[in-house]
């Protein structure tokens, strides 16, 4: 197999091959040039980062820190990586790229040489085998005519007896020319035959084989170039691997348990002797009736001591109850953190638990403070009880002197203690609250589908809906539906309302048959149809009978097969978000729910869809449907082309005009006014949770934290992760969410909008921002922000919720501002 033996008549294909290879080499050359540029820029960026860090790290703590050592080594190794990448880029330029450029020129020369030789030998072959033979054949035919003419004239001369010799001479001459030409033709024909054989058997194959040899040599050269490129650009070379090994080793040397040992040694202070708190006996120098550390029981104090004892007993009991609640909250949070820790996939996922761990430590501090208060109240109560019991049944002795002073002092002490208790009681009030479920319900009524339909097509099959949502759908005796277990994918459950209770029966699958406790069936629809039509009890013990199938809301239910997942758009709180396509070619956004999420998070995932089902507004992201027929569950939303508002602001900051920013704010106000009218509290209003659609229409999105409350107020335990910089003080302090707290968040959204995507409270941590707000601090308006907008922000950030404007007022004010800019 080879060019010479198999490609004799494939000249055009060979030319196309060479053209294609030249284009490929040009593409490779362009790619390598861009790779060199990219690597140089990457190396330069790394070096700039290291230089910047060096400037910012000039101030060092005066103790030895393993974290600092590790960080310093990471910077040093990053600098080393920068130098390596720069060297690699230079080697790539002087090596593979330079050789590839030379090879392209050689390739072009080979092509040119091949075309020239091929044209030459082909022209020679055509000349010998066609052109020259055709000329001889034409002359041959002409001489035959001339000879025949001379022959006829010779015969005529013989017949007439005139000029016979002359005619004979002409005849002989014509015959001689013909015979000589005949010999030339025979020789030329023989030569043409041999030339043709030589052309196809030797000359052309030799040219093609020569071309193939050069082609293969160039492939060999290209392979060498690729090999050198691979070695130079490899990220697993020994020098690069060593860089990362050094970094990894430095990270492994970080030991949280010993990190602060040196710091403690450097800054250790000797324990100061505690000052003893004793009764100041100098107070008694001018009074003989009072004794140090003794409760005075007499006719003036006996009654007040009883009141104080009763008050202290009540205070102690309340403190003990608070302490019990706090300790339960500690145990609950510890359990929650432990469960979350088990689901962490990466070491860095521990960051997600830090806020919860901080909340746990704060709870423990509160517990300790309450224990201290309990011990104090107990000691005070014991002291009072001892004095009261000592004098039980006795008549209080009279006080001769300073009755009024004694009464005043006693009264003041009582007031001080009561005041102190009140301050303690108020400081710990509202810490422990129970979260409320906010899942709604929907009314459904339809008849059962025939058992021949697949399970997913049965009206009474609701897919992987949460247990609590299934229970809300069951209202009357005999109401039933089938669902996939939310906690155990692949397991199916029959949910029934019977005798005032909502019962849940796992559908058993044994020996390829579905059953409860009686007859088995090959599929679930047949099993349910049997119990529904025959009214046979589900189990003898329960006596439950199926009467009313509860159909699913078909308006929103989609099949997984109706959606084709496309590119990954990003990651949400519960799973990935993809671009998808419906059967009618509609582009949508598909939110997925990870199958390994805890049950409570899966319920929250579907909560967003349940809320959005009820809404239809141009400034609220639209729900298309949900896919709950099997795991993983999908929420299908309209695809909003502009992406999230925060990224949009940062990307378009040089293009956005003031009028457009006001329009965005007005859109947000309109959307929130609509939500307020539906008694919906968003709880997480921020630029990152808004989307920008066609014609720059802003839409409120991400209802994962939202709640619907008839009273317009939602209480939270306060132990969950919340967006602190966007959340109102009353929500942070007491877990009280309302439309007024959403107004506070709207003010932060305004600040984000007119700062073009800057993070609120720049330079502050969450805790610092929270403390500053409590002290009365409010962010100043962003640069170029209109004064009217700044005033609206300040109104939104009024500490008292009742003083904040309504969304209807905000919409009116923003409309006026927009008109002024027109």
UniProtKB/Swiss-Prot annotation:
It is an enzyme of class 2 (transferase). Its main location: cytoplasm. Residues 123-185, 301-390 form a coiled coil. The active site is at residue 684. ATP binds at residues 569-577, 591. Residues 460-550 form the SH2 domain. It is a peripheral membrane protein. Residues 563-816 form the Protein kinase domain. It comes from the Eukaryota. The modification Phosphoserine is found at residue 434. Belongs to the protein kinase superfamily. Tyr protein kinase family. Fes/fps subfamily. Homotrimer. Interacts with ARHGDIA, IRS1, JAK1, NRP1, PIK3R1, PLEC and TMF1. Interacts with PPP1CA and regulates its phosphorylation at 'Thr-320'. Interacts with CTNND1, EGFR, FLT3, PECAM1, PDGFR and STAT3. Interacts (via SH2 domain) with CTTN. Interacts with HSP90; this stabilizes phosphorylated FER and protects FER against proteasomal degradation. Component of a complex that contains at least FER, CTTN and PTK2/FAK1. Tyrosine-protein kinase that acts downstream of cell surface receptors for growth factors and plays a role in the regulation of the actin cytoskeleton, microtubule assembly, lamellipodia formation, cell adhesion, cell migration and chemotaxis. Acts downstream of EGFR, KIT, PDGFRA and PDGFRB. Acts downstream of EGFR to promote activation of NF-kappa-B and cell proliferation. May play a role in the regulation of the mitotic cell cycle. Plays a role in the insulin receptor signaling pathway and in activation of phosphatidylinositol 3-kinase. This is Tyrosine-protein kinase Fer. The gene is FER.
């Amino acid at each position: 197999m080879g060019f010479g033996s198999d490609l004799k008549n494939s000249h055009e294909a060979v030319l196309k091959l060479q053209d294609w290879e030249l284009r490929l080499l040009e593409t490779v050359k362009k790619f390598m040039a861009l790779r060199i540029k990219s690597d140089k820029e990457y190396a330069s960026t790394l070096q700039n980062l290291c230089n910047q860090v060096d400037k910012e790290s000039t101030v060092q703590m005066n103790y030895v820190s393993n974290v600092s050592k590790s960080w310093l080594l990471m910077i040093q190794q990053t600098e080393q990586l920068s130098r390596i990448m720069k060297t690699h880029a230079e080697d790539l330029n002087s090596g593979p790229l330079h050789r590839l450029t030379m090879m392209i020129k050689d390739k072009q020369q080979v092509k040119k040489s091949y075309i020239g030789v091929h044209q030459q030998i082909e022209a020679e072959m055509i000349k010998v085998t066609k052109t020259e033979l055709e000329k001889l054949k034409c002359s041959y035919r002409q001489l035959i005519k001339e000879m025949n003419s001379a022959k006829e004239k010779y015969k005529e001369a013989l017949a007439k007896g005139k000029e016979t010799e002359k005619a004979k001479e002409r005849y002989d001459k014509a015959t001689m020319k013909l015979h000589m030409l005949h010999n030339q033709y025979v020789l030329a024909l023989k030569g043409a035959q041999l030339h043709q054989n030589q052309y196809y058997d030797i000359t052309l194959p030799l040219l093609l084989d020569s071309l193939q040899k050069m082609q293969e040599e160039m492939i060999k050269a290209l392979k060498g170039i690729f090999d050198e490129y691979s070695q130079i650009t490899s990220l697993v070379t020994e020098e690069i691997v060593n860089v990362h090994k050094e970094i990894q080793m430095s990270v492994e040397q970080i030991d949280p348990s010993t990190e602060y040992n040196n710091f403690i040694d450097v800054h250790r202070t000797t324990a100061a002797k505690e000052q003893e708190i004793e009764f100041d006996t100098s107070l008694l120098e001018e009074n003989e009736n009072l004794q140090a550390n003794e409760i005075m029981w007499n006719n003036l104090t006996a009654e007040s001591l009883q009141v104080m004892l009763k008050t202290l007993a009540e205070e102690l009991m309340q403190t003990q109850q608070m302490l019990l609640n706090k300790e339960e909250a500690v145990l609950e949070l510890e359990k929650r953190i432990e469960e979350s820790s088990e689901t962490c996939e990466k070491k860095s996922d521990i960051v997600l638990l830090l806020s919860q761990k901080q909340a746990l430590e704060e709870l423990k501090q509160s517990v300790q403070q309450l224990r201290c208060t309990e011990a104090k109240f107990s000691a005070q109560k014991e002291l009072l009880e001892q004095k009261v019991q000592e004098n039980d049944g006795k008549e209080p002795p009279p006080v001769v002197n300073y009755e009024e002073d004694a009464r005043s002092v006693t009264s003041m002490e009582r007031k001080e203690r009561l005041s102190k208790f009140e301050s303690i009681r108020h400081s710990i009030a509202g810490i422990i609250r129970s979260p409320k479920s906010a899942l709604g319900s929907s009314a459904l009524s339809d008849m059962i589908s025939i058992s021949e339909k697949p399970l997913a097509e049965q009206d009474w099959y609701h897919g992987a809906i949460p247990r609590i949502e299934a229970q809300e759908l069951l209202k009357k005796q005999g109401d039933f539906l089938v669902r996939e277990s939310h906690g155990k994918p692949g397991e199916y459950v029959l949910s029934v309302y019977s005798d005032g209770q909502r019962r849940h029966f796992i559908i058993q699958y044994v020996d390829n048959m579905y059953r409860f406790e009686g007859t088995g069936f090959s599929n679930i629809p047949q099993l349910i149809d049997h119990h529904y039509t025959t009214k046979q009890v589900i189990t003898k013990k329960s006596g439950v009978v199926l009467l009313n199938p509860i159909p699913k809301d078909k308006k929103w239910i989609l099949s997984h097969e109706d959606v084709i997942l496309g590119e990954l758009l990003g990651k949400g709180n519960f799973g990935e978000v993809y671009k998808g396509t419906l059967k009618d070619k509609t582009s949508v956004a598909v939110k997925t729910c990870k199958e390994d999420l805890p049950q409570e998070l899966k319920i929250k995932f579907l909560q967003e869809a349940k809320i959005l089902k009820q809404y239809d507004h141009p400034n609220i992201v639209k729900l298309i449907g949900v896919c709950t027929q099997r795991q993983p569950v999908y929420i299908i939303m309209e695809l909003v082309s502009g992406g999230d508002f925060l990224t949009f602001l940062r990307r378009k900051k040089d293009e956005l005009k003031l009028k457009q920013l006001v329009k965005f704010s007005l859109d947000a106000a309109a959307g929130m006014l609509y939500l307020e009218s539906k008694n919906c509290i968003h709880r997480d209003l921020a630029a990152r949770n808004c989307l920008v659609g066609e014609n720059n229409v802003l839409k409120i999105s991400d209802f994962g934290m939202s709640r619907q409350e008839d009273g317009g107020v939602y209480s939270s335990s306060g132990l969950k992760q919340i967006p602190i910089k966007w959340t109102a003080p009353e929500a942070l302090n007491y877990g009280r969410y309302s439309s007024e707290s959403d107004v506070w968040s709207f003010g932060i959204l305004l600040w984000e909008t007119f700062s073009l995507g800057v993070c609120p409270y720049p330079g502050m941590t969450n805790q610092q921002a929270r403390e500053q707000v409590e002290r009365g601090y409010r962010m100043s308006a962003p640069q170029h922000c209109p004064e009217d907008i700044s005033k609206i922000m300040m109104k939104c950030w009024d500490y008292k919720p009742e003083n904040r404007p309504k969304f209807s007022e905000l919409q009116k004010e923003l409309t006026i501002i927009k008109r002024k800019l027109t």
